[in-house]
Curated annotation (Swiss-Prot):
Lineage of origin: Eukaryota, Metazoa, Chordata, Craniata, Vertebrata
Keyword field: Amidation, Amphibian defense peptide, Secreted
Protein's cellular compartments: Secreted
GO terms of biological process kind: defense response
Superkingdom of the source species: Eukaryota
Keyword flag DNA damage: no
Family the UniProt entry places it in: Belongs to the frog skin active peptide (FSAP) family. Rothein subfamily.
GO cellular component terms, semicolon-separated: extracellular region
Protein purpose: Lacks antimicrobial activity. Does not inhibit the formation of NO by neuronal nitric oxide.
Protein name per UniProt: Rothein 3.1
Length: 30
């Protein structure tokens, strides 16, 4: 499960979505 997917489950953490999406992209690129 991706970090972004976990955040999508909680609307209270909307501000973290862009950050975690970026982290997911970085991890995928490794």
């Amino acid at each position: 499960a991706s970090a972004a997917g976990a955040v999508r489950a909680g609307d209270d953490e909307t501000l973290l979505k862009p950050v975690l999406n970026s982290l997911d992209n970085l991890v995928s690129g490794l």
